[in-house]
Amino acid sequence: TTTRNLNALQEEGMIENAGEFESTGGRKATIYQCVSNYRCAVGIDITRNHLTIVLIDLALNIIDSKRMRIPFRETHEYFSILQEEFEAIVSANIADRSRLLGIGISLPAIIGEDHKTVTYATVIPLSLNIYSFFSNYIHEPYLFFNDANSAGLAESWKGDYTDSVVYLSLSSSVGGAYMNGRSIHAGDNNRGGEFGHITIVPHGKRCYCGRNGCLDAYCNANALTDFTEGNLKEFFEILKFGKNKGIINIFNEYMENLAIAVNSLRMCFDCDIILGGNVGAYMSDYLDDFRKKAVKLNPFEKDGSYIQ
């Protein structure tokens, strides 16, 4: 019966009593919720120049995390550091390894449906046997995920989005995801959401993909950090101070280019657009100005509140 199953789950420590619903005339119904720390998972994010490891519980609360600047190399030295940092976080927080559900590894690459193969990668060099190479250093179950899809799902789940939403990731590369609730539309070839390769300037700057004029060439984080020796935080600190006209002009140009892409996404999907990634984390102070730039390109609306 339902009651017996609920009691069994409580005894196992998987669920707990969270109060009662308001009465609708009869006996008040009990509210049960998942015990968030019953299980946990690790996320490993690998980019061109950074490694991030995050431990989360079932409610997506961050238990522990570590981010470090280290250029990616498919070498023993790099993976030994990854293994050491992974073990340090897990050992410090999990006494019983059976509580660890597994590991999601996000990569700036197009991932196969089996989540074990990389079908396209140019941002960082990945060999064909990269999945098995990981097994020399990580001994818990793990799967590969596209970086922007991972970030988009996290935003969707944490923000409890139920409608369609576009996530635009602005980091060392530009990517994204189109989500309907908590489901990603990956497309026929798992390339849905590769917004970084929308052409915004025909015959423009060279992109890492080999084409010219891609959004990525204009709006990845390097478009800003190239002027502060790779330090994004420093760029926005100088920008906030408001005295460096060069930095101000660079950011204005960045927002103009980004507005072209955001307007195109709005025309295509007609839903909210979340600006994420490393640059997106700094955009809150400039969101009103950016919305004004975007709606100037929009023939249908003058309210830019769909940009978040």
Predicted features by range, described:
Residues 1-42:
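N-terminal charged helix/coil linker that caps or initiates catalytic domains
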Residues 15, 134, 142-144, 305-308:
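Generic structural signal for residues in well-ordered beta-strands
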Residues 28-64, 167-180:
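Gly/Thr-rich phosphate-binding beta-strand-loop-beta motif of the actin/hexokinase/Hsp70
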Residues 62, 117-118, 184-185:
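Hydrophobic "anchor" residues
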Residues 77-95, 215-218, 223-284:
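Adenine-nucleotide phosphate-binding core of ATP-dependent small-molecule kinases
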